[in-house]
């Protein structure tokens, strides 16, 4: 199937989806309605671009016809030639855009995510920077209309985070934040530094797609569940009922502790969400390593230890080392305005995939 047949098939399906979504039987079936709505939304940009492309093709035909029928009118012929030139340039632009839109989509792109941030090298300063990153992602999520929920947090004595886990829910969350996994380095003068020297610290970020139970089934025999008395949030009934939950996946020794909620059941549900995502991510990493993973050939390994970005406070500079992007607007980015960085990473990834496809 050539590119034009693919595009026509996408448009035909889009029109079919429009009819289905107005069918009373579909509207009354919430699950099916949501699935079809999501499919329609995922094809919308492609269909809009394809329809605009077809109009450009018609503009070329019209301009060529005008040149033939100019009847010696030099001004009319000149105008038609300019229109033809512009339309042909537009045609090339649309063809590149449509190739990108037809690239195979990451099946996880529409998913919610589990976001883990940890203070790494640098002690208290690293923990404080982990808090800065948490705020950055939280503000970005708010701007996108996403829901941001802190599920688990371990703080240090100066208000930073040893580790914090959040759930980010909304439209296409993973597609935009999947490039954030890795080591984020900060260069700044810590508040505790009396000599004014710049210190370098690191916080690590891991972005994992949310994994539903039906998608990834963990054998209950592989889990050890411990119930104990909460020492933090949920402490109002700490002396009456043991509400905190620790779940260990025995084959990998991956563990999650949850005590943020006031009931054992809610803590258990949240802990299972996190451990399901971590275990699935663990085995996905192994599989990708064995296959010379896509993320190694495009934008890094996605590994927590790979340095991906530097935030330099004295120079108000952010550098993404994977794509050589440098922006002198650190304050803007840390305030949650991540679009310029995210868009550059998405474009780079798409370009790399397109080059691979054309080889």
Swiss-Prot record:
It is found in: Cytoplasm. InterPro entries: PCRF (IPR005139), Pep_chain_release_fac_I (IPR000352), Pep_chain_release_fac_I_sf (IPR045853), Prokaryotic/Mito_RF (IPR050057), RF-1 (IPR004373). Methylated by PrmC. Methylation increases the termination efficiency of RF1. Its main location: cytoplasm. GO terms for molecular function: translation release factor activity, codon specific. It holds the Pfam family PCRF. GO terms for cellular component: cytoplasm. The modification N5-methylglutamine is found at residue 236. Keywords: Cytoplasm, Methylation, Protein biosynthesis. Belongs to the prokaryotic/mitochondrial release factor family. Peptide chain release factor 1 directs the termination of translation in response to the peptide chain termination codons UAG and UAA. HAMAP family: Rel_fac_1. NCBIfam families: prfA (TIGR00019), PRK00591.1 (NF001859). This is Peptide chain release factor 1. It comes from Streptococcus pneumoniae serotype 2 (strain D39 / NCTC 7466). The gene is prfA.
